[in-house]
């Protein structure tokens, strides 16, 4: 891992001593965890393209371990020292340049020493590394924080001078974690985060009020429907036999009534003028002539001697029942027809009584 400077000095070509370069493939790379200082000209800004700005790792290693710094010194990728561009003169000059770089890095760390602790323990930037790294940005992409210049300004400018360096980075991290379901926070930080996002939790009462209005609207609709049912004057089909149909039509002359009768076909179907079909219906001893006009549909096949259901209105002047629908009656209709006739008679009595009083 280490080259001997004596062996490298023995190989001199063209009157210049070769510059000992460190093999970068075998070096132990340090993670880029710290933020660079843009105003300091001595700090390299090569790591800005990675989205997590930091100091070069060789300066950090020299600041922590200054005794092994001369053996691990490499060419700086951000800015090349002035001593590296000239021929090799002596090891003393190299050690002086390394020490000057180490002092410059320490002075760069002392730039923020007015507001924060400048001890070597400040290298524990794990919370800050999580918030600045690209993986963390993808994890907390739902946090409404601008990741551009505002994030760099937030991590570079000390908003809380009395707190350590890593506390400043934990504040936006905790606000982002408060939105996640699996986040765990303790103490006043959790309470402050919950207070910061309190308006988002106040939507549940709004939903409850909205949901609470639905039964009220349903009750209003039911009330309006109930009122409509009371004032409903729509057309109704009156179930009646032939005798009761003639009776109600004679007593209620000014109202158009639509009757429903169940009777037995007592004649063959004959064709008449204007696409009409005539036939006779019998109910006990009462016989009623009927007519059906095939205007929009044809008359279905009727069988003589069977019970049929006829719907239409009665013309007392011509003594004819003008049908609008004729079909064979089902067994259930024949069973319930007598009950329907009783209900219709009661309704018609009430209707005639009200109209006579008016």
UniProtKB/Swiss-Prot annotation:
Name assigned to this protein: Spermatogenesis-associated protein 22
Subcellular location: Chromosome
Key words, A-Z: Chromosome, Meiosis
Annotated Polar residues bias: 1-12, 30-51, 81-121, 150-159
Quaternary structure annotation from Swiss-Prot or TrEMBL: Component of a multiprotein complex with MEIOB and RPA2. Interacts with MEIOB. Interacts with the complex BRME1:HSF2BP:BRCA2.
Region (Disordered): 1-51, 81-122, 150-172
Tissue/organ expression: Specifically expressed in gonadal germ cells, when male and female germ cells progress through prophase of meiosis I.
Gene field: Spata22
InterPro entries assigned: Spata22 (IPR033536)
């Amino acid at each position: 891992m280490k080259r001997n400077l004596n062996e490298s000095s023995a190989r001199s070509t063209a009157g210049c001593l070769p510059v000992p370069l460190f093999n970068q493939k075998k070096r132990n790379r340090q993670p880029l965890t710290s933020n660079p200082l843009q105003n300091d000209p001595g700090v390299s800004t090569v790591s800005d393209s990675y989205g997590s700005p930091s100091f070069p790792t060789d300066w950090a290693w020299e600041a922590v371990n200054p005794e092994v710094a001369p053996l691990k010194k490499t060419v700086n990728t951000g800015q090349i020292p002035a001593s590296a561009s000239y021929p090799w003169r002596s090891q003393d000059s190299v050690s002086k340049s390394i020490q000057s770089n180490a002092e410059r890095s320490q002075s760069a760390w002392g730039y923020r020493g007015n507001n924060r602790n400048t001890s070597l323990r400040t290298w524990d930037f794990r919370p800050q590394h999580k918030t600045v790294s690209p993986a963390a940005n993808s994890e907390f992409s739902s946090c409404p924080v601008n990741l551009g210049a505002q994030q760099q300004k937030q991590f570079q400018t000390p908003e809380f001078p009395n707190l350590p360096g890593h506390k400043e980075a934990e504040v936006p991290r905790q606000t982002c974690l408060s939105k996640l379901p699996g986040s765990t926070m303790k103490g006043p930080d959790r309470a402050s985060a919950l207070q910061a996002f309190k308006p988002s939790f106040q939507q549940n009462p709004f939903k409850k009020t909205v949901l609470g209005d639905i039964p009220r609207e349903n009750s209003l609709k039911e009330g309006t429907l109930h009122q409509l049912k009371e004032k409903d004057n729509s057309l109704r089909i009156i179930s009646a036999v032939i005798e009761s149909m003639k009776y109600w039509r004679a007593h209620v002359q000014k109202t158009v009534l639509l009757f429903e009768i169940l009777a037995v076909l007592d004649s063959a179907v004959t064709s008449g003028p204007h696409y009409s079909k005539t036939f006779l219906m019998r109910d006990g001893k009462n016989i009623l002539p009927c007519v059906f006009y095939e205007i929009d549909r044809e008359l279905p096949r009727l069988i003589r001697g069977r019970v049929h259901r006829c719907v239409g209105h009665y013309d007392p002047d011509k003594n004819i029942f003008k049908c609008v629908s004729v079909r064979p009656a089902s067994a259930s209709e024949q069973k319930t027809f007598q009950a329907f006739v009783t209900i219709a008679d009661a309704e018609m009595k009430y209707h005639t009584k009200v109209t006579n009083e008016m």
